[in-house]
Design a protein with these regions (language model features):
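Active-site phosphate-binding/coordination module
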Residues: 38-141
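Conserved acidic, metal-coordinating active-site core of Asp-based
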Residues: 121-236, 257
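Conserved beta-strand/loop elements of the cytosolic catalytic core of P-type E1-E2 ATPases, chiefly
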Residues: 33, 102, 209-213
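Short, structured coil segments at secondary-structure junctions
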Residues: 50, 72-74, 82, 191-194, ...
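Short, Lys/Arg-enriched N-terminal segments with co-localized hydrophobic residues
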Residues: 6-18
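Asp-based phosphoryl-transfer active-site loop
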Residues: 20-35
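Mg2+-dependent phosphoryl-transfer enzymes with acidic/Ser/Thr/Gly-rich catalytic loops
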Residues: 19-20, 39-40, 207-287
Length: 287
C-alpha cells in the first residue's frame, strides 16, 4: 500500500472539520469593518448566506456594534468591551447581559482623576452598558464620533456623576502623539492596580478594562455554554489583541491587512478588510 505523506493526511483531516464549523468569532475594526468603519453590503450578504452562527468579539461597546449586528442579522451571543460583557439582543432591541466584568467604582474615580490631572491633553471617556461619557469635546472625541457615528453624553460634574455609577466597563484614552502615548501607558502601569488590564488598540487608543475582561475568556464562556469543541470553531482577526482568540479556535483566519507576525499563526490568510475578507474567507475556507 502506498504511504500517504503526513502533511496530506493532516490537510485532509482539517478539511473534514472545516465542513462542520458551528460558530465563527469575528473581530470588528480592521477585520469585519472596512476603512469607513462599515460592513459593506456585499460582505454582509456573503456572511449571512453561509448560514454559520457568528459572534462579534470587540473592544467596542454594544451601541457601537449595533449597526454590524443589524447588518448581519445576528440574534445570538456577542462579546463587547474585550470580553467585559457577553450579551445578546432582546426582542425589543435591548442589550441583555449574560456575563459582566465591570471596573470597581473607586478604581474608576482614581483613574479618571489621575489621568485628567497628569494628562489634560489626552481625550478621556468611559462607558457603561448603554452610554458613552466624556467631560469635554476634543479632537479624540470627534475622531471617535466620526468612526462609530455615536454621540457621547457630556458630564458637567464628574465627581457627582460617578457617585451614582457602579457599572463602568471601559475607560478609553485617545492621543495622536506617540510620546504622549508612551508616557500615559507608563503612568498607568506605575499605579500598579491589580484588577485592571491596560491594552493599546491601534496607534491612537489606550483602553482600560477589568482584569478578567479578555476576548479569550468571552470565547471560552461561549464554548462551554454551547459545548463546542475547538475543531468546530473559526475566527477572523487582524491585530495583536486578536491573538488569544485566534489561538483558541480550530480554524484561525487572518486578514491580508494584518501584521506579518499575526499572519504567521494563521491557517489561511483571507483578503483585506476593504475587500470583504471575512465573507470571502467564510465562503472559500469554511464551507
Amino acid at each position: 500500500m502506498e504511504r500517504v505523506p503526513e502533511f496530506i493526511m493532516v490537510a485532509k483531516e482539517r478539511e473534514v472539520y472545516f465542513m462542520n464549523i458551528k460558530r465563527i468569532f469575528c473581530d470588528m475594526d480592521g477585520t469585519l469593518l472596512n476603512s469607513e468603519g462599515q460592513v459593506s453590503d456585499s460582505n454582509a450578504t456573503l456572511i449571512r448566506d453561509a448560514g454559520i452562527p457568528v459572534t462579534l468579539v470587540s473592544a467596542r461597546a454594544p451601541m457601537e456594534m449595533k449597526d454590524a449586528v443589524d447588518a448581519l442579522q445576528l440574534r445570538g451571543v456577542q462579546v463587547a468591551f474585550n470580553g467585559g460583557l457577553i450579551y445578546r439582543i432582546g426582542d425589543n432591541n435591548e442589550v441583555l447581559p449574560i456575563r459582566t466584568q465591570i471596573i470597581k467604582k473607586s478604581t474608576v474615580k482614581q483613574l479618571l482623576r489621575g489621568i485628567r490631572q497628569h494628562f489634560p491633553q489626552v481625550s478621556l471617556s468611559y462607558y457603561d452598558l448603554n452610554n458613552w461619557y466624556c467631560d469635554k469635546i476634543d479632537e479624540g472625541i470627534r475622531y471617535e464620533h466620526n468612526l462609530t457615528k455615536q454621540s457621547p453624553t457630556f458630564i458637567h460634574n464628574e465627581d457627582q456623576f460617578l457617585e451614582g455609577k457602579s457599572n463602568t466597563f471601559k475607560i478609553m484614552m485617545i492621543t495622536f502623539d506617540e510620546e504622549n502615548m508612551r508616557e500615559l501607558a507608563k503612568y498607568l502601569q506605575s499605579l500598579d492596580l491589580p484588577e485592571i488590564t491596560i491594552q493599546r488598540s491601534g496607534k491612537a487608543y489606550l483602553e482600560i478594562t477589568h482584569l478578567l475582561a479578555k476576548k479569550s475568556k468571552g470565547i471560552a464562556h461561549i464554548l462551554r455554554k454551547e459545548q463546542l469543541t475547538k475543531e468546530e470553531t473559526a475566527a477572523f482577526g487582524d491585530g495583536h489583541n486578536d491573538l488569544p482568540m485566534l489561538e483558541m479556535v480550530g480554524s484561525p483566519i487572518v486578514m491580508d491587512n494584518a501584521f506579518d507576525d499575526i499572519k504567521a499563526i494563521a491557517y489561511k490568510i483571507t483578503k483585506s478588510n476593504d475587500e470583504d475578507g471575512v465573507g470571502y474567507g467564510i465562503q472559500n475556507f469554511l464551507k
